[in-house]
């Protein structure tokens, strides 16, 4: 399968376009990029990988509206989402991890606890409802996000291999 790493990579790859510049401003403030911007970028990624036998989306969709729009895009290709994998991690652990990542990566949006907390609030408000959206379709798989990278990776691979 082709791995599409969601809106963040899509935006960073197209930050020279008007949509990319606009989207990056939202990301730098820890906010979600508007759906119409993200959907357009993801649609372009799908088209440029149209011979793939499948897709793995990392960090996308982030809202139920995006999930519905993604379903519509995939319907045109006569494919559908097989599963949603959600990693369970407490907020305080996320803050700790992202601050550490900010030190090593230099990413400005990972160097401020206030921006990180804002991203977590945005997640709880806009992204967390995706669990119900995909659970209602029997596609939700929750995995414990605490543990070794190897263990977590094995758990994710087990879900993917079971599809």
Predicted segments, located by residue:
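Conserved nucleotide-binding/hydrolysis micro-motifs of P-loop NTPases
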Residues: 7-8, 61-65, 89-95, 103, ...
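P-loop NTPase switch/communication element
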Residues: 13-25
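Glycine-rich phosphate-binding loop used to anchor ATP phosphates in small-molecule kinases
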Residues: 29-74
């Amino acid at each position: 399968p082709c791995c599409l790493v969601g809106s963040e990579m899509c935006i960073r790859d197209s930050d020279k376009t008007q949509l990319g510049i606009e989207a990056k401003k939202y990301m730098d403030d820890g906010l979600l990029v508007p759906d119409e911007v993200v959907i357009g970028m993801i649609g372009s990624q799908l088209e440029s990988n149209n011979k793939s036998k499948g897709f793995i989306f990392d960090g996308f969709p982030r809202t139920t509206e995006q999930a519905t729009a993604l379903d519509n895009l995939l319907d045109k290709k006569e494919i559908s989402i097989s599963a949603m994998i959600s990693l369970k991690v407490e907020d305080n652990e996320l803050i700790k991890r992202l601050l550490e990542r900010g030190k090593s990566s230099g990413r400005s949006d990972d160097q401020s606890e206030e921006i990180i907390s804002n991203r977590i609030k945005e997640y709880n408000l806009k992204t967390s409802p995706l669990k119900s959206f995909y659970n209602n379709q029997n596609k939700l798989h929750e995995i414990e996000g605490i543990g070794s990278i190897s263990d977590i990776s094995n758990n994710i691979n087990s879900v993917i291999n079971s599809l």
